[in-house]
Amino acid sequence: MEVRKLSISWQFLIVLVLILQILSALDFDPYRVLGVSRTASQADIKKAYKKLAREWHPDKNKDPGAEDKFIQISKAYEILSNEEKRSNYDQYGDAGENQGYQKQQQQREYRFRHFHENFYFDESFFHFPFNSERRDSIDEKYLLHFSHYVNEVVPDSFKKPYLIKITSDWCFSCIHIEPVWKEVIQELEELGVGIGVVHAGYERRLAHHLGAHSTPSILGIINGKISFFHNAVVRENLRQFVESLLPGNLVEKVTNKNYVRFLSGWQQENKPHVLLFDQTPIVPLLYKLTAFAYKDYLSFGYVYVGLRGTEEMTRRYNINIYAPTLLVFKEHINRPADVIQARGMKKQIIDDFITRNKYLLAARLTSQKLFHELCPVKRSHRQRKYCVVLLTAETTKLSKPFEAFLSFALANTQDTVRFVHVYSNRQQEFADTLLPDSEAFQGKSAVSILERRNTAGRVVYKTLEDPWIGSESDKFILLGYLDQLRKDPALLSSEAVLPDLTDELAPVFLLRWFYSASDYISDCWDSIFHNNWREMMPLLSLIFSALFILFGTVIVQAFSDSNDERESSPPEKEEAQEKTGKTEPSFTKENSSKIPKKGFVEVTELTDVTYTSNLVRLRPGHMNVVLILSNSTKTSLLQKFALEVYTFTGSSCLHFSFLSLDKHREWLEYLLEFAQDAAPIPNQYDKHFMERDYTGYVLALNGHKKYFCLFKPQKTVEEEEAIGSCSDVDSSLYLGESRGKPSCGLGSRPIKGKLSKLSLWMERLLEGSLQRFYIPSWPELD
């Protein structure tokens, strides 16, 4: 009996809890949650949401109910910021997206949904660390924000690569990879790899900027470029991914064959050279990361002591092959400038070693940036920095003045004095500023002691009076000046403003352009196939659409040309059709009714230059309408010709030209011989032969099929009835031809009247009803 009572009590308690949950769900009012009225604008709603979100964010507010409150605030803003959801809620009390149901059904869905959303399980009971507040605090240490990423991570990625994880709440895969991620980042961070974590829920802008559209995502950043990790999340794959981010030419493999060349490169590269001797055949990742961090200051090489061909180096430099040994060489390749040897080299030890040896003993000033680093501006009297500058000529081998200057620098190394040298022929303005009398030092070396006063180039300096030849007396004088300078800084009595140094090691313009182009192509390739596929879709759609239109136009045009050639019949077939009274038109009347594309008629002169393109190789289906004129009738005939043919310029198959009768009479008369009947041909020795007037003639030339149609000016009413017809040769052969007689010449009427019927002839040309005169081949136009 007692057990039954206890069961009833538990049932009653469960029902009571469910009722309370349902009532709380029904009582959910987004306006009340955000503290705004039902008539509030979107600006007021957004302002209230931002204020409450900052106040109740679980990462900032440690109140136990902050998480539930923040969820309610987010849900309320989601409803009220969407006009459709807001209207649905105002009418039916429903915050859902389905609006096609009736009011009662919507209310039932509303009750069930809000009951589900307000019934939470205790995550700690199931040990599911979904919430970022209860998740391992290791991610909080590396959380990135957009401003931090842009201002710090991107610039720092030029010195070290970054490995970034994109995560979010309620991400099962994120939980699955977390143990591996924790192990790998602890290992890589000790090697010098930057680590970052982006929460996609709170930093959507940064996640979108990185191109991460799903969680979890892992990406690497180096030199400002983003690369995504696409393999299984295991330790070896992540290490290989970080190693693949680094350039492949950071570390050079050195053996007995090339170590002299490698170490001798200090003069050309103006850098110290570092050699690591180790027993592993693969270059350690720590050494590669160090080489990337200091690539602008030193050159790095690696010697695998287990390989044959390294015995000479190990013996010469007394290397212990059982422990990693790091050597740095400067101007002397016979002995290292510094050495460290340890079985477990840490990053901090290597960084300290490299920092001490970043520059040569007497480095060459090759850029303004290097000048600022070697000769910094003084900040106080206790932080004075002096630069002893050797101005010398460039030589392929070490000159005696430079060797003496180098030995002096080695013997007098101080914290407040830096020794540098400048090639006076490469930095002419810089050298002339420091030399009081450049002619006296022509072809000789000189030494100046200077101190920079500001970043604008103002310096105080003292130049040795005599040229520097490297003798013992020169060294004694320079040493005396340096000793005196410690006691009296006023020794530097001269003052000047130095010009900026030119960058001697900068690549030429073509190389810079090539590198920029290759980087741009690489970025586009990565963006298309890896990083931002969704963002690239509009651009890809535009490119493929343009290519489709382009190739589609070419293909259609090609098929159109082939159809024209296929439909064209041979001259013999056309002659047979003409004999039976049937002609095959090459143009349609629709062409004549096209609206002109331009407000003018484009008429070109037919010369020996344009003859081939405008006639001989004219495309199939195209014709060239040529007006015959002389120099005296050119202006008037062209004006009338343009008026007559203007309505036909809408056809793309017609081209218009004019031919000078004074230049090409023989060519014209050769063509007209094919337009004559059996009547006697005038003899060329006839006295009227050269006086024949062809001005006003119009020829329609089909270059592909080798035929033409002829228009002749008409004189009488009877003759005008046959205008443009080439079929009645007997009645039109000699019409319009002047024999030089006033009674039958054309001088009695205006010149423009010759083309008064040309438009009618053009219509018949487009109909295909004109007679065609075929020729075997087009004559040359001399």
Curated annotation (Swiss-Prot):
InterPro entries: DnaJ_C16_autophagy_reg, DnaJ_domain, DnaJ_domain_CS, DNAJC16_TRX, J_dom_sf, Thioredoxin-like_sf, Thioredoxin_domain. Residues 562-593 are annotated as: Disordered. Keywords: Autophagy, Endoplasmic reticulum, Glycoprotein, Membrane, Signal, Transmembrane, Transmembrane helix. Residues 557-782 are extracellular. One of its GO terms (cellular component) is endoplasmic reticulum membrane. Residues 119-247 form the Thioredoxin domain. Changing C171A: Does not lead to enlargement of autophagosomes when overexpressed. It is a single-pass type IV membrane protein. Residues 26-535 are cytoplasmic. GO terms for biological process: regulation of autophagosome size. The keyword NADP does not apply. Residues 1-25 form the signal peptide. Coiled coil: none annotated. Residues 583-593 have a biased composition (Polar residues). The keyword Glycoprotein applies. It is found in: Endoplasmic reticulum membrane. Changing C174A: Does not lead to enlargement of autophagosomes when overexpressed. The chain crosses the membrane at residues 536-556. Glycans are attached at N631. Residues 29-93 form the J domain. PROSITE patterns: DNAJ_1, DNAJ_2, THIOREDOXIN_2. Plays an important role in regulating the size of autophagosomes during the formation process. This is DnaJ homolog subfamily C member 16. It comes from Homo sapiens. The lineage of its organism: Eukaryota, Metazoa, Chordata, Craniata, Vertebrata. The gene is DNAJC16.
